[in-house]
Amino acid sequence: MIKGSKICGISDLDTLNFIINHSYPPQFIGFICNYKKSSRYVEVEKLNELLKLDKKKSKFVAVLVKPDEDILEKIKHLPFDYYQIYDCTAEEIKEIKQKYNKKIITALTIKDETDVKKYQLFYEVTDIYLFDSKGYEKSMAFDHALIEKIKINKPLMIAGNIQVNDNLENYKKIADIIDIS
């Protein structure tokens, strides 16, 4: 059953203001912090300005692809509630979680069933699982049926070319949270 939503790739103040002050704001708002290939990438200086806004009920999420020490140090003072991490090992995520004291959304990119099974490696270090496509900046889709049978005691989020005008009923039995780009 869908319990929340995340809008990802926010990069301007007008959009951020609109969604935060909406009658039904998203539970999570994501900012692309270090993946420069994305058209939604936001420089740290701009993040400083955007994140001064009162987030009200929403949680701010730093979206990080294989983050290095440099970016983690640059954003550590920003009011992120979660770090959404792609392409790191469980050990690397554990170190980040301990050092920066952030909740973790472990992002797993999915192409086939082998990719899905990797979620078990991250159970101890993740607060929320995100199953996404391998498309990154291309917002590609993946077969969501691959994750229908997963039963875990942690929230499950799905992404992968989910659009606001999609029939969201299709995702109710799969995920707790949907990530709309």
Regions found by a protein language model. Give the residues of each.
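Conserved N-terminal beta1-alpha1 strand-loop-helix module at the mouth
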Residues: 1-179
